[in-house]
From Swiss-Prot:
Similarity field: Belongs to the Antp homeobox family. Deformed subfamily.
Gene Ontology molecular-function annotations: DNA-binding transcription factor activity, RNA polymerase II-specific; RNA polymerase II cis-regulatory region sequence-specific DNA binding
UniProtKB keywords: Developmental protein, DNA-binding, Homeobox, Nucleus, Transcription, Transcription regulation
Protein name as catalogued: Homeobox protein Hox-A4
Primary location class: nucleus
Amino acid sequence: AANGNFNGSESKRSRTAYTRHQILELEKEFHFNRYLTRRRRIEIAHALDLSERQIKIWFQNRRMKWKKEHKLPNTKLRLP
């Protein structure tokens, strides 16, 4: 890390590999709701065998992806 004395055995989380089923369910939920209540996050976490934190972060990342995909084109460059 930035401080130079990071050793590999410290608790750096490994990347979560979601199953097709988990992604399908998360995408389905995102289609109806871009934001989750805590209760709904808990329900999804239990149903998909993931942690609340994983659900929360997946939704944060998915919202950023959605935002990038739906960005309005830059109108300054267009000439009449």
